UniProtKB/Swiss-Prot annotation:
GO terms for cellular component: cytosol; extracellular region; peptidoglycan-based cell wall; plasma membrane. It catalyses: S-adenosyl-L-homocysteine + H2O = L-homocysteine + adenosine. It comes from Mycobacterium tuberculosis (strain ATCC 25618 / H37Rv). The keyword Nucleotidyltransferase does not apply. Binds 1 NAD(+) per subunit. InterPro entries: Adenosylhomocyst_ase-like_sf (IPR042172), Adenosylhomocysteinase-like (IPR000043), Ado_hCys_hydrolase_NAD-bd (IPR015878), NAD(P)-bd_dom_sf (IPR036291), S-Ado-L-homoCys_hydrolase_CS (IPR020082). May play a key role in the regulation of the intracellular concentration of adenosylhomocysteine. The gene is ahcY. Homotetramer. This is Adenosylhomocysteinase. NAD(+) binds at residues 219-221, 253, 282-287, 305, 340, 361-363, 409. There is a cross-link at K474 (Isoglutamyl lysine isopeptide (Lys-Gln) (interchain with Q-Cter in protein Pup)). Its EC number is 3.13.2.1.
Length: 495
């Protein structure tokens, strides 16, 4: 380290004032702290939880390893967890999503300086390689005292959970399987990390798995992984599916996306959206936010869907429902939002208009066939960070690809705004408290937060926006068969 600038050429943690970390530049901490203070005013859910729980310290003793986009909003979450008594180590869950000033602010802490940081260990910087990303994930899960490993995981996308559970699985098998030639590049890096670690430590991940009391998962893709682990009998600790809390999925996924998709495309391309033909792949909560955002800009929007219910919803909102093959040749902008893989393949990319824009807002980079594009012989010119112009020599057509097929709203912009993330992160904090303080009540299965906690999060934010809720009379509550104070809807209610 030279001055405050952290070099990442050597993958070893930096240590200052007893804190190990690896970030871009500690001198950015003051800028990060200023933005963090503004964000706190826009995150009433987290600030309310600080006021409610600061004295009782419900997370005292919790050692939380967190894998979630290292943004300003996440910085407020991290400092909420520590304010409630937890110790925390952090890494980002995406190679492009870190806001370097936010990472610096968290390491330095509210009472430290770059020369004497007093914050939280963070291992994240914008523009990591895959090798750096998985190295950082391991550092986040590796606590200084081997006798006091992580005992809670806070995850987004399931990478931290997968690292622990797959690592334990391979340790018990006595071997890390070899990568196949056609495996994705990231899977090869993942297996190599586990293989290298197994050579020096035969039970690292097993010890961590046995210590972990639970995991709380932020996003749709990570929840899918959790259910797959549970179905296979491989889930070694309880999990709370935060994503399917109503105040997460119906707000973060839809309204957050509605804001940040446009921001990412504007910052990445400066292209006018109005009047353009836009194809949104997927019409779940995220896809709905995308389609609504594009419609609001005056675009002509079409949607692809596998589910007839979602497809009918799209048509009732005025969107054409088409197949990729039908629409790809006419689309000016294509956005994938399915949570699935192999949505836009090389043959689709080759059929796109000259200078059409292609991006993804699903969690992983496998919705767009980036590997096929890289093998195609197309030439790549980097226009600016996370904006690439790919040109096919046989046709002369060029395609603008955002964030290398990864989350464009975080790679090209700054992600979802603070207020909507306050909903999601309030749920995360409550879920961490729930699993930590009531661990005996949970088996190694996937759970959702109870309805009354969902309503609690919503109530905080309604009041913050100046709304006034109507209060049921006792007679009205009896008529509906609910309590005066709620919950007001059954679990099967679809908001």
């Amino acid at each position: 380290m030279t001055g405050n600038l952290v070099t990442k050429n050597s993958l070893t943690p930096d240590v200052r004032n007893g804190i190990d970390f690896k970030i871009a530049d500690l001198s950015l901490a003051d800028f990060g702290r200023k933005e963090l203070r503004i964000a706190e005013h826009e995150m009433p859910g987290l600030m309310s939880l600080r006021r409610e729980y600061a004295e009782v310290q419900p997370l005292k003793g919790a050692r939380i390893s967190g894998s979630l986009h290292m943004t300003v909003q996440t910085a407020v979450l991290i400092e909420t967890l520590t304010a409630l008594g937890a110790e925390v180590r952090w890494a980002s869950c995406n190679i492009f999503s870190t806001q370097d000033h936010a990472a610096a602010a968290v390491v330095v802490g509210p009472h430290g300086t770059p020369d004497e940081p007093k914050g939280v260990p963070v291992f994240a910087w914008k523009g990591e390689t895959l090798e750096e990303y998985w190295w950082a994930a391991e550092q986040m899960l590796t606590w200084p005292d081997p006798d006091k490993p992580a005992n809670m995981i806070l995850d987004d996308g399931g990478d931290a959970t997968m690292l622990v559970l797959r690592g334990m699985q391979y340790e018990k098998a006595g071997v890390v399987p070899p990568a196949e030639e056609d495996d994705p590049a990231e899977w090869k890096v993942f297996l190599n990390l586990l293989r290298t670690r197994f050579e020096t430590d035969k039970d690292k991940w097993t010890k961590i798995a046995e210590s972990v009391k639970g995991v709380t998962e932020e996003t749709t893709t990570g929840v899918l992984r959790l259910y797959q682990f549970a179905a296979a009998g491989d889930l070694a600790f309880p999990a709370i599916n935060v994503n399917d809390s109503v105040t997460k999925s119906k707000f973060d996924n839809k309204y957050g996306t509605r804001h940040s998709l446009i921001d990412g495309i504007n910052r990445g391309t400066d292209a006018l959206i109005g009047g353009k033909k836009v194809l949104i792949c997927g019409y779940g909560d995220v896809g709905k936010g995308c389609a609504e955002a594009m419609k609001g800009q005056g675009a002509r929007v079409s949607v692809t869907e596998i589910d007839p219910i979602n497809a009918l919803q799209a048509m009732m909102e005025g969107f054409d429902v088409v197949t990729v093959e039908e629409a790809i040749g006419d689309a000016d902008i294509v956005v994938t939002a399915t949570g699935n893989k192999d949505i836009i393949m090389l043959e689709h990319i080759k059929a796109m208009k000259d200078h059409a824009i292609l991006g993804n807002i699903g969690h992983f980079d496998n919705e767009i066939d980036m590997a096929g594009l890289e093998r195609s012989g197309a030439t790549r010119v980097n226009v600016k960070p996370q904006v690439d112009l790919w040109t096919f020599g046989d046709t002369g057509r060029s395609i603008i690809v955002l964030s290398e097929g990864r989350l464009l709203n975080l790679g090209n912009a700054t992600g979802h705004p603070s207020f909507v993330m306050s909903n999601s992160f309030a749920n995360q904090t409550i879920a961490q408290i729930e699993l930590w303080t009531k661990n005996d009540e949970y088996d190694n299965e996937v759970y959702r937060l109870p309805k009354h906690l969902d309503e609690k999060v919503a109530r905080i934010h309604v009041e913050a926006l100046g709304g006034h809720l109507t209060k049921l009379t006792k007679e009205q509550a009896e008529y509906l068969g609910v309590d005066v104070e709620g919950p007001y809807k059954p679990d099967h209610y679809r908001y």
